[in-house]
Amino acid sequence: MSLALGQKDPMPAAAPAGMPDDAVVVRGLNKTYRAKSGSAVQALIDIDLAIPRGSLYGLLGPNGAGKSTLINILAQLVIKTSGTAAIWGIDLDRQPRAAAAAIGVVPQELNIDPFFTPRELLELQAGLYGVPKAERRTMEILGNLGLADKSEAYARTLSGGMRRRLMVAKALVHTPPVLVLDEPTAGVDVELRQQLWSYVRQLNAAGTTVLLTTHYLEEAEELCDRIAIINHGRVIACEPTAVLLRRLDNKELVFILEEDLAGVPAPLARFEAQLQSPRRLMLRYQPSRTRIGEILAAVQAAGLNIVDMTTLEADLEDIFLQLTRRDSTGTGHAA
């Protein structure tokens, strides 16, 4: 199965004249629920986000952080308590129908009517959005997502991965300039995950702004050019992915040695060195304070013969855990 864009792009790469630079803007967004006990539960607290037009934007956070609440507000499934939200320059309060037409949402839940075929489901969805029959791209979209041969099969007969793709197809029937993917690869195998990644990249390259929530940090690191992290209803980080990855000023060097060692040599004692096995030596250092040349000079002074050397850097998972732990202890801050 191959996922590839068809002849017609889902959205032109350049926005119409006069359109704002940001595809989604939320300012001072708050959502408070009333618990059964009568106490107030704040799901979102003063959220400020600006998602650049044409970006592939990641929204991360632990369970209960507020990600789904934010998405449901943008999809107009949840009413915000206060603040403003605009999609493609359209205010949700002033022009709710126009704002709804500018966004496609792929929910995490596979809520598909089992008694309709994929073709029928897309035709119904297009009708709900007022897409004229002559402008509908039902078979093109199904083909793009590898579902053309299942267009007349009942949805209940589709596999979980096919249903996930069908949810993406439903969100694209009205050619929205903004696409929200809520955990799009949850429960799918590795091959399908890679195929969906490829299709998301193609949509984004064609001009669609993509907002992605995911629990797979590898997915966000692989796809997203900018990431916001939400914890306890607040934005605790919002930066380009590359900048976030530079936040942890830590690297590890692993040396594979030619001869066995009984302990860490004295010239390396000033580094955070650890003998992982008789011929495997690991050193931790901060690139901002220590140059790699200093370490190599110390290795030479210790008389070590190196067979191989690898460098390990912090990944998004390390940063995510550090930020959420810091925020939970009250030392974090909203970005």
For each feature predicted by the language model, list its residue ranges.
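Catalytic Walker B motif of ABC-type/P-loop ATPase nucleotide-binding domains
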Residues: L179-D182
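Walker A (P-loop) phosphate-binding loop of ABC-type ATPase nucleotide-binding domains
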Residues: P62-G66
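Conserved ABC ATPase "signature" region
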Residues: E123, G127-K150
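Conserved catalytic motifs of ABC-family nucleotide-binding domains
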Residues: T175
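Conserved ABC ATPase signature
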Residues: Y154-L158
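ABC transporter nucleotide-binding domain
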Residues: W197-Q286
